[in-house]
């Protein structure tokens, strides 16, 4: 009655096309990941149908699960007489929450984001004709994986950073920023290049869920190692 969710249960059925391989696993893992729940059960079915094989594109599996869960969150909020944002704040995952898919969260920004959104003037501004205001929470993972970079400090104080992950959306710029911050030098002193395969150690697949995250960690460790030497 106080708005605290005690348990959550979901059954997901994802269409995989002519062959198995729908993103139902990611949907099941992310469905309740935004919330601090003591009891969770999620069942997923990878359904084969007479259609073309599907492929991943941007957080595969997660938006569909989020749409279903967030729609229910709004319904539950109304039933207990709470605003949707307050209901989410009440149940939001935070640092120390054991996620619905296993790991315990470190520092995450969901709760602070919701609280800031609630305080923003736009959230309380009167609505005009044919206007509405909605909100929802979503989740996606950062994946690690084997990653290798090479960082060299030149005689003129500039830094050459070789990475083995092709640039997708400015990832080289992110690596330069991380290296510069860790080394305590200006950003324009760092140059990142995508090196040949044979010049670096092994790198796992380059995709949007791991490139900046995993290559960034490797860059930071390489910079710290350079400082020690």
Task: Show which residues each predicted segment covers.
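N-terminal leader/propeptide and maturation segments of large enzyme subunits in energy/redox metabolism
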Residues: 56-118, 208-229
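Helix N-cap/coil-helix junction residues
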Residues: 82, 123, 184-185
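Short, basic/aromatic recognition patches that contact phosphate-bearing ligands
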Residues: 103-140
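Gly/Pro-rich active-site capping loops and adjacent beta-alpha segments
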Residues: 1-65, 127-229
């Amino acid at each position: 009655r106080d708005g605290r969710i005690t348990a959550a249960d979901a059954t997901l059925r994802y269409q995989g096309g002519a062959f198995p391989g729908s993103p139902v696993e990611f949907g099941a893992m992310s469905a309740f990941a935004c919330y601090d729940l003591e009891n969770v059960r999620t069942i997923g079915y990878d359904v084969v149908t007479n259609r073309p094989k599907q492929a991943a594109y941007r957080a595969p599996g997660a938006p569909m699960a989020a749409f279903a869960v967030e729609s229910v969150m709004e319904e539950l909020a109304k039933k207990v007489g709470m605003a949707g944002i307050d209901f989410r704040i009440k149940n939001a995952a935070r640092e120390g929450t054991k996620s619905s898919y296993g790991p315990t969260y470190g520092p995450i920004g969901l709760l602070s984001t919701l609280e800031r959104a609630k305080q923003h003037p736009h959230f309380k501004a009167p609505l005009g004709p044919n206007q509405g205001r909605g909100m929802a929470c979503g989740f996606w993972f950062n994946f690690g994986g084997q990653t290798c970079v090479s960082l060299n400090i030149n005689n003129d104080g500039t830094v050459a950073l070789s990475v083995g992950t092709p640039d997708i959306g400015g990832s080289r710029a992110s690596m330069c920023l991380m290296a510069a911050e860790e080394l305590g030098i200006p950003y324009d002193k760092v140059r990142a290049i995508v090196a040949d395969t044979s010049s670096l150690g092994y790198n796992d697949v380059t995709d949007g869920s791991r490139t900046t995250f995993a290559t960034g960690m490797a860059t930071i460790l390489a910079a710290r190692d350079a400082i020690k030497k």
